């Protein structure tokens, strides 16, 4: 019996994109923790040339359709991504980069919802220090208390 190892699609898609840019031919490798309970790091990118590694943390979201059609008319995207504010779990230095990942439909008028061709990834790579600043700035409008979510 072979053990089964699973990887969330968000992490797989990000790793696939990184390896398109930083391939094995350039001396880069990706390492994923064998245990999914490993906290603070989802994968490492290692440079054999420089013998250095960078730690990545992936945060993913579903895409949501904007309720207000006027916002689309004003030039805002039709879809938005909502992320949990993980400020209470954030600790500077745990990862060098945070990846915000989401899928959105580029076939807005299509009735087919599950076809691969109708979904595109959005991948934002944010350095650790900037992620801390972003999470600190996520506040409610009235009371200026930390908000539970932020959107892209």
What are these regions (language model features)?
Residues 1-39, 44-152:
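Mixed-charge (Asp/Glu-Lys/Arg
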């Amino acid at each position: 019996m072979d053990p089964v190892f699973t990887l969330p699609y968000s992490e797989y898609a990000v790793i696939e994109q990184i390896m398109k840019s930083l391939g094995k031919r350039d001396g880069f490798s990706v390492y994923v923790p064998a245990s999914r309970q490993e906290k603070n790091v989802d994968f490492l990118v290692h440079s054999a040339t420089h013998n250095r590694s960078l730690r990545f943390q992936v945060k993913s979201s579903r895409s949501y359709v904007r309720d207000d059609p006027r916002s689309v008319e004003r030039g805002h995207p039709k879809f938005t991504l909502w992320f949990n504010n993980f400020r209470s779990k954030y600790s500077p230095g745990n990862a060098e980069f945070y990846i915000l990942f989401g899928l959105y439909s580029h076939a807005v008028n299509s009735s087919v919802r599950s076809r691969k061709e109708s979904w595109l990834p959005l991948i934002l790579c944010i350095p650790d220090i900037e992620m801390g600043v972003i999470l600190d700035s996520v506040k409610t409008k009235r009371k200026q208390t930390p908000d539970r979510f932020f959107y892209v």
